[in-house]
Amino acid sequence: RSAMTDAPDRPQGCIDRVGFVADVTPDGQAIAQGQRMTKTWRFRNDGSCPLTEDYFMVATAGLQPGAQRLFRFGTTIQPGQEGDVTISYPVFGSGTQRVDFKLSNPSGTTFGLGPQQRGALWTEYIVQ
């Protein structure tokens, strides 16, 4: 199966909706250039689809050209439950950096946080 295809266990007609609970890893960390930024968010699955390892965090702005843009969830969060999602990537540049993200289901449909699926999600850190 490719990285972004329909998952066989995805309930037909289910709704993707994710609520933000907390930044487990706070923004504003100082990181040396070339080191890895590791960010963890706590989400609540407010939809009817299980959020599985076939979901992704998708970087939509702020990364270097050619950088990895898809990051697997690496966990499953059932509807009505909370769970942590962690991503990691190398940092470049200097000063305050921000990378914006959306979520993506196994079909490749991207969406944001909240009831309207438009809520913003990002990492912000200082490269030294």
Predicted segments with their positions:
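Proline/serine/threonine-rich low-complexity linkers at boundaries of modular beta-sandwich domains
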Residues: A7-V21
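Intrinsically disordered, low-complexity Pro/Gly/Ser/Thr-rich segments with frequent PxxP/GP/PP motifs
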Residues: A67-S94, P106
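Short, solvent-exposed loop/turn segments enriched in Ser/Thr/Gly
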Residues: G34-T40, T96-V99
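Short acidic, flexible loop segments centered on an aromatic residue
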Residues: R44-G66, L103-N105
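Short beta-strand segments of immunoglobulin-like
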Residues: T25-I31, G74
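Short edge beta-strand/loop segments characteristic of extracellular beta-sandwich folds
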Residues: T40-D46, S88
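Short beta-strand and strand-turn-strand segments in soluble, beta-rich domains
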Residues: R17-D23, A59-F73
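Terminal connector regions
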Residues: E53-D54, G93-Q128
